[in-house]
Amino acid sequence: MVATGTGVPSLEGLRARRDEILRIAALHGASNVRVFGSVAVGYADAGSDIDLLVDLEPGRTVLDLSGLILDLEEALGRKVDVLETPRRRTRVAMQIRREAVPL
């Protein structure tokens, strides 16, 4: 589990497992892994999930994204949400991009 000793996911905990996370991402055609949401801004609690933003290789599908989520949840022992980097410039997409920090 990614934790600081209290069961709270942290950016530092994720970065300690960076190589493992990037290896899993690459298996599913994902790169440029970034963290956003409560973990990125330091507001996570014991019930928080991990929100990741990724770039997917051309030709990859929702099945690749689903496989990535399942493999990361198994490795990290916590619910993980993964979004592909939005191509459109909506207000929500811009907020996520601003908040996202490199793994």
What are these regions (language model features)?
Residues 1-32, 40-46, 57-103:
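Catalytic core of pol beta-like nucleotidyltransferases
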Residues 35:
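Conserved histidines in hydrophobic membrane contexts and catalytic metal-binding motifs
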Residues 54:
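Structural signature of FAD isoalloxazine-binding scaffolds in flavoprotein oxidoreductases
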